[in-house]
């Protein structure tokens, strides 16, 4: 069985490559010429360079290929200009799918990695309740909007295309760079949180996302959308306390900033990003993510239909993640990855 994994050099994609190889699949890793191959060293991997900005170019690059499965994990989570989200996440998906259709590739499954963020802050009334699949999405970030537009494009194709959409909450684990900023901050004695009111947060460990992808390949129903979390609901203090525990309980100053101050900081970050041409972690999208108070969602359909059972609760996942950061020297100032 052959599988094409886009975004193969990234956090999610590289873990998918690992699992596909372990399953004995013929693995094709879609990368850019500039992509790092740090986590793609296995000699069994076949590399293919794909240009998602051009449907015509994709047709040329994919001609003669015949994959059983495609997992589309390529995309961007932060950009200098909001329009770039649409160009990469929405149009890139459209171009890839249209190229596959033009080539009449006999796919068995196309798995699209979307996000819980397509729903935005739709259930902020207390007591908090779970977002469910019948709710109307109302994304409050440019990233979420671009992912929802890609979902709607897939829905518009109809039953002739065997697609399945996964909507993970915040993904963390080894090789991940965004949550790592929080780990690094706590290691340097500063724990930062946004807002004073209750915030219900959900997480999913990377290997549980990988599990869900291959369950969707094996058991998923075409056209379905599945939420992914570890099944728990947490507070921001819980996450930071677990990180501190795994770091050896360093002394730490815990700061809770009001949302108005966070708004100023992220607006400044947005301006700096546009001036330097480099995306900044604290940007307008990040403000809306941190402002949102309820990240609960219903994973029962995922469990019932796919047989998905998360193996990593937050405590174990944080333990494995911090251990990996230590072993790979990410907590060293000189060895920390660039974002």
What function would you assign to each model-found segment?
Residues 216-282, 315, 319-322, 332-338:
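Mid/C-terminal beta-alpha module of Rossmann-like enzyme folds, strongest
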Residues 149, 176-181, 194-217, 223-224:
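Substrate-positioning beta->alpha
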Residues 206, 241, 265-274, 278-309:
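Conserved C-terminal active-site "lid" loop/helix of NAD(P)H-dependent oxidoreductases
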Residues 3-23:
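N-terminal Rossmann NAD(P)H-binding glycine-rich loop of SDR-like oxidoreductase domains
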Residues 138-164:
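Active-site Tyr-X1-5-Lys
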Residues 95-142, 164:
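Conserved Rossmann-fold NAD(P)-dependent oxidoreductase catalytic core, especially the SDR/UDP-sugar
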């Amino acid at each position: 069985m052959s599988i094409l994994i886009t975004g193969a050099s990234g956090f999610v994609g590289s873990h998918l490559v690992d699992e596909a190889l372990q399953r004995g699949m013929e693995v094709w890793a879609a990368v850019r010429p500039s992509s790092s191959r740090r986590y793609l060293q296995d000699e069994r991997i076949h590399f293919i360079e794909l240009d998602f900005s051009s449907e015509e170019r994709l047709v040329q690059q994919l001609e003669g290929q015949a994959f059983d499965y495609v997992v589309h994990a390529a995309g961007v989570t932060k950009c200098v200009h909001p329009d770039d989200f649409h160009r990469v996440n929405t149009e890139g998906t459209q171009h890839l799918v249209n190229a596959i259709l033009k080539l009449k590739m006999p796919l068995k499954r196309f798995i699209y990695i979307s996000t819980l963020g397509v729903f935005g802050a739709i259930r902020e009334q207390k007591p908090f309740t779970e977002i469910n699949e019948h709710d109307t999405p109302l994304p409050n970030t440019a990233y979420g909007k671009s992912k929802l537009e890609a979902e709607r494009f897939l829905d518009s194709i109809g039953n002739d295309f065997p697609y399945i959409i996964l909507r993970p909450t915040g993904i963390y684990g080894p090789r991940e760079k965004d949550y790592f900023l929080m780990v690094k901050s706590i290691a340097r004695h500063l724990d930062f949180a946004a807002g004073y009111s209750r915030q219900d947060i959900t997480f999913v460990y990377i290997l549980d996302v990988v599990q869900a992808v291959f369950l969707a390949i094996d058991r998923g129903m075409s056209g379905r959308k599945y939420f992914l979390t570890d099944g728990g609901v947490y507070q921001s203090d819980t996450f930071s306390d677990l990180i501190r525990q795994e770091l050896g309980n360093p002394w730490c100053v815990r700061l809770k900033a009001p949302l108005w101050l966070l708004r100023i900081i992220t607006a400044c970050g947005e301006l700096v990003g546009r001036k330097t041409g480099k995306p900044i972690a604290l940007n307008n999208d990040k403000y809306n993510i941190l402002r949102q108070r309820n990240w609960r969602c219903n994973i029962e359909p995922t469990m019932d239909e796919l047989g998905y059972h998360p193996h990593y609760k937050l405590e174990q996942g944080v333990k494995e993640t911090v251990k990996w950061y230590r072993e790979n020297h990410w907590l060293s100032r000189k060895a920390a990855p660039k974002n």
